[in-house]
Structures are given as C-alpha cells and as structure tokens.
Amino acid sequence: MYDNTDNNGTVRCSFCGKTQEEVKKIVAGPGVYICNECIDLCKEIIDEEFYDEAVRELTDVPKPQEILNVLNEYVIGQERAKRTLSVAVYNHYKRVNQSETAATQDDVELQKSNICLIGPTGSGKTFLAQTLAKTLNVPFAIADATSLTEAGYVGEDVENILLKLLQSADYNVERAEKGIIYIDEIDKIARKSENVSITRDVSGEGVQQALLKILEGTVASVPPQGGRKHPHQEFIQIDTTNVLFIVGGAFDGIETIVKNRLGEKTIGFGKTNSALNEEESIMQHIIPEDLLKFGLIPEFIGRLPVMAALDKLTNDDLVRILTEPKNALVKQYQKLLSLDDTKLEFEPEALKAIAAKAIERNTGARGLRSIIEEIMMDVMFDVPSDESIEKVIITKMAAEGTGKPTIIYNKKDKEAV
C-alpha cells in the first residue's frame, strides 16, 4: 500500500499510488485514499465473483419433486404438464452439469431435450416457463414467433431471440448460455399444408428452418444492438448447446387431427372416440405425427422431443387461480387496498362470476386481471380520498356489472351499495 501523501503534501491513492492530478477523483477515508479507477476495478472483481456464483448455483439442480412443489405454489391445475416440465428441466440441467464435468471421452453424450407446450390461450404456458426460470435463477427471455422472418426479409432475425436472453443476463455470456428461452405462438409458423409449397413462406417453414440450428445447439453470432440497423457492429458469440428452448402455441384445430387418428385406429376394435376416458382431454393424446400434419416440419419436431399438453381451464380452475397461488390476484388487490387502510373481500359467487366472464371472453387466466380492473376501477379511485371507508365487498352483482361493490364505513353509520 502506498503512502497517502508525499513530502509536498500531494494526496495519492493508497492502492495504485496515483496522484490527484492523474485521476478524476480520490475518495478519502480514515487514513486511506482510493481513486475512481481503483473503485471501478474493485467493482469489476466483485461483479465477476457474483456472476461466477450465479453460474455455479446450477450445479445443485432441484429435484423434479422440488420443482413441482414450487410450480404448485404458483400454478393451479395442469398437473400432468407440471410433472412433465419438472422432469424435463431437471434432466436438462443435469445434462448441462454432466457435460461440464465429463472427465473422459468415453462418457455418454446426452442430447438436449427442448420442450413443446400445447394448450389454449390463457392456460398458463408462458407463466409456467417464467416460473421455471425464476425457480432455477437463470436468465429468461420471451419471443413471439409471429415477428420472426428468414434472414433477408423484413422482420426480426432468429438471432434477436438470443439478444433478449443476453440482455436478461446483463450481457454475461456464460450465464446466458444456461438460460431459458420461451418462443410463443409457435403454431403460427406452421406450413399452410403438409405438401411442400413452391412459393416462398418467409414467416412459416422458412422460420422453422432458421430456428433449427439454435434449437439443436450452435455458436450463433448475436448483434448487441439488434442486427439490421447496425450492420457494422461487432458480434457476440453465444453457444446455444445448453440453452433450454420451450416453445408454446394453441394449435387451434389440432384436436380434429388427433380425433381422426384415434378414430381410425380404434374402429377395428369396436371402439369410437367416445370410448376415450371422458376425464382425459383429447390434447393429452397428441403425438409428433399430429404436429407434422398440422404443419411443423419433421426436423423442427425432432428438436422438440418433450411434449406437454395443457387443458383448457374450467370455471373452478379460474376461481382457484384467483385465490390460491402465492401471488393470486385477489391477494394482490387486497394488498393494494390495505396500503390505504381498507379491507377488501370477494364473495364466493363474485369469484365464480369473474371466472365465468373470463371463459365467456375466451381469455383464460390471462383475462382475469382486466376483469377485476373493470370491477375495481371506481373503488380504487374513491378509497384513497375517503378515509372513512373501512371495507369494500365485491358482490356477485358487482362482478356481473349489474350493481356496485358494497362499501362499509368506519365513521359514518351507514352502508352504501
């Protein structure tokens, strides 16, 4: 460590010895000085250690049951899909750790198992992927397949998906290479028919072809500023071998393909589609051949070996979603009003009415918040300005839009409806 001052009284950095004139700023402590350059260096060292810790965290991958337990706290229903995802994610990161610690060339190389989620809008596909990434503390990015086009056409390149993941990892490449990418609306890039078309399909089969390499694992050149607008920028190299890709889509109409296939195979045994277990969704019987008939190319399907079907949420499921998860919507709005010292209660019939509205609008769980916002708008406007409001009760009539919430006052001996 350098002396703080010399014979001329010049202040020096205690770490690098530079004078006040040689640096931008020197910060004084009890008998110690440090310059801005040494502060920056210390920050870099600390950041690197934190990044190393974040990368090392994955060596202790939660078991499938532990992953399922976390999913159960946040996601209602979809039991089969949650179990499938728990096993697939555990196996993926076990494979990542094995590839890093493989000692000899005789070790069996484990192939990557990307995941395809099939289910209607609002059934929880995106939320499941987000919860998995949060549970594992890995970078997470969402992309929309409908915005992607082949290189050379107007639209987003597939490399832009990796840019979003890199940004989520604060541009730490090593962390990004162990992240999760969720590609939504994957069914929208299906071929229009099984037959190969001679016309160019720049947002369909062409995008599937463009995605093949990064799904399988390749070293991709990612433009840090977004590609086409900055053609002369330096590229960042990202290896996608250990990136877990989860794709999702509603696949409207695929149930007809499944029914036709099951019907053809059961006729010889005197069974019909109605002989299937009524409690089981037809979607649970999807196989890769059905995706092929829907319009995904064989090479693309081959890179999505794990398939999980999500059922359409029922009225009871939506009521549970409103109240049971850790961050349930009802709990969120109760918390909001509690900040204004006001209690909030939803009558059971009101919850059923809210769920019925979501089903009527065909929005699933995704539409629940907007419905509650409509119901709560006047309440959330009035409560902050009226300290006499003690409690708000959301009734069935209020939920249906035929009445107003019940207001209970603490100072005025009355009840307004």
From Swiss-Prot:
The keyword Nucleotide-binding applies. It comes from the Bacteria. Residues 1-54 form the ClpX-type ZB domain. ATP binds at P120, T121, G122, S123, G124, K125, T126, F127. Disulfide bonds: none annotated. One of its GO terms (molecular function) is protein dimerization activity. Zn(2+) binds at C13, C16, C35, C38. The keyword Metal-binding applies. Coiled coil: none annotated. Belongs to the ClpX chaperone family. Component of the ClpX-ClpP complex. Forms a hexameric ring that, in the presence of ATP, binds to fourteen ClpP subunits assembled into a disk-like structure with a central cavity, resembling the structure of eukaryotic proteasomes. ATP-dependent specificity component of the Clp protease. It directs the protease to specific substrates. Can perform chaperone functions in the absence of ClpP. This is ATP-dependent Clp protease ATP-binding subunit ClpX. It comes from Enterococcus faecalis (strain ATCC 700802 / V583). The lineage of its organism: Bacteria, Bacillati, Bacillota, Bacilli, Lactobacillales. The gene is clpX.
